A protein has these predicted regions:
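Primary mode marks residue(s) on the alpha4-beta5-alpha5 output face of response regulator receiver
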Residues: 34-246
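Residue-identity detector for glycine
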Residues: 19-22, 241
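Bacterial N-terminal signal peptides that target proteins for export
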Residues: 2-10
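Composition-driven recognition of long, C-terminal low-complexity regions enriched in serine/threonine
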Residues: 9-12, 32-36
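Signal peptide processing junction and immediate N-terminal pro/mature segment
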Residues: 22-34
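Bacterial N-terminal signal peptides
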Residues: 11-20
């Protein structure tokens, strides 16, 4: 019952984001003006100093992810086992196949053999190629807890934040160089959102971290994206308005 309720909540959030998050994830299609706004909608954990056991711990999680991914080279097997594609009809660089049951469990307990999402790339023939996995934690988890799961000296967990839902009649303002709403918009505060008649969400989803265990470059194994080209400047200290509210 609790898992079903959690799934319904996730479905409601997915509906809220439909039509905006897909474009966000497909960053190569976004104009430079929009990119400057994205920093106000993502919080990334700062890198911590490396501790003696951090690399070993991170390597163990990556190995567990690789083993968990092994049965799902064929995306149809993932679908058959309860993974659902997030926004399958929206063009994206990476497609998240999410198992809500694992997402619920991850809010209370970390099991690296049960990644919340499998990450696929669309292939030219319309199929999907498995490239990575995603682990999650609840919104209110502390950075110390995240560090216990995957060390913050190696991986940077992230949250999507400061989402202003557009009022009826203004949904076109989710997009374009003058976007105001959503994950690409210029609005990053509750006050500004209210002034434009929107509904403000301090954060959407919870904590996330991506792992790409097939990568040979250690820097790419724990990158936010498999090419990780747009998050380099999104540091903990360089982003105004990024503190989380509960």
């Amino acid at each position: 019952m609790v898992v079903r309720r959690f799934s319904r909540v996730l479905a409601a959030v997915f509906f809220l984001l439909a039509g905006t998050v897909g474009l966000y994830l497909h960053r190569r299609t976004v104009m430079a003006a929009d990119m400057s706004h994205m920093a106000g909608h993502m919080y990334m954990t700062p890198l911590r100093p490396m501790q003696p056991s951090d690399q070993q711990k991170a390597d163990a999680v990556a190995a567990a992810a690789k083993q968990a991914m092994a049965p799902y080279q064929d995306y149809k097997k993932a679908l058959a086992d309860g993974y659902e594609i997030f926004l399958p009809n929206v063009p994206q660089h990476i497609y998240h196949f999410t198992k809500h049951e694992y997402g619920f469990e991850a809010a209370f307990h970390f099991d690296p053999s049960k990644p919340t999402s499998l990450l696929y790339k669309k292939t030219p023939d319309g199929s999907y190629k498995l490239v990575g996995a995603m682990y999650t934690d609840r919104v209110r988890a502390s950075e110390d807890e995240l560090n216990e799961r995957v060390p913050l000296s190696i991986a940077r967990w992230h949250q999507h934040i400061n989402f202003c839902k557009a009022p009826e009649g203004r949904k076109a303002e989710y997009f374009g160089p003058d976007a105001k709403f959503g994950l690409l918009g210029s609005i990053t505060t509750e006050e500004a959102c209210a002034a434009h008649g929107g509904k403000f969400y301090p954060h959407i989803f919870g904590w996330m971290v991506h792992v790409y265990p097939y990568e040979t470059d250690p820097k790419k194994i724990w990158s936010v994206d498999d090419d990780d080209q747009d998050h380099d400047n999104m540091s903990h200290s360089a982003m105004p308005g990024m503190q989380m509210k509960d």
